Each structure stands twice: as C-alpha cells, then as structure tokens.
C-alpha cells in the first residue's frame, strides 16, 4: 500500500472522529475545551486530502508535501486527542501535548508551502 493511500485512509478516520466529537460536543453539553478538537480533525483531514491531490498531480515536491501531510495527521491527532482525553478522562495525554500538536500543525503548513516552492525532480 502506498503512502498516499495510507494517508487517505487516515484522513477518513480523522474525519469520522471529528464528526463523532462534534456530535458529542453538541449532545453532551458545551463544556471544557472540546470545541476545538473536532474542528482540528475535520479541517486537517481535508488538508491531508488536498495535499495528496497536489502530490498526485505533481504540483508540489512529493516527498516534502508527504512529510507535511504526515505532520497534519500526527499533529491534529495529538491536539484533538489531548483535548478529548482531558475532557472525558480528566487527565492529559502528556504535558504540553496540545501546544506541541499546534506547533507541529504550524510547521506542517510551512513545510507544505516549502513543497510548492522547492523544485520538483524530473522523472
């Protein structure tokens, strides 16, 4: 299975989890910091899919863009996972997990920008 297909599957999982968290937030009450978790998952699932589309069309440098997509998956999962765990289990994933996820999201967006500027290899 290719990296692109794995990332597409992970984006689908992120989207499903984002919808489930949004439903939990809507039906279980607006408490805590959970509101940001579904948004991060849904938005960055779309970003992963868009990045893969750019890679498949050779618009961006493939390896750099795939690194950005992997960063989106890890970072959004870390960010949302920590907020969700804090809301429902009462403890954090690990200290500074949410800000670490946010920082990695910023870095991933910058890496994606770099992938558009970096010269692509000719086959």
What would you call each of these model-derived segments?
Residues 1-123:
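Polytopic transmembrane helical bundles with strong interfacial aromatic enrichment
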């Amino acid at each position: 299975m290719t990296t692109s297909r794995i990332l597409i599957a992970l984006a689908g999982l992120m989207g499903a989890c984002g919808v489930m968290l949004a439903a939990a937030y809507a039906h279980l009450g607006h408490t805590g910091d959970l509101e940001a978790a579904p948004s991060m998952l849904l938005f960055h699932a779309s970003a992963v899919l868009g990045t893969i589309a750019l890679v498949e069309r050779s618009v961006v440098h493939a390896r750099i863009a795939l690194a950005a997509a992997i960063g989106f998956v890890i970072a959004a999962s870390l960010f949302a996972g920590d907020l969700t765990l804090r809301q429902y289990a009462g403890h954090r994933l690990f200290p500074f997990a949410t800000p670490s996820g946010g920082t990695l999201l910023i870095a991933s967006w910058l890496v994606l920008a770099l992938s558009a500027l970096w010269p692509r290899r000719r086959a």
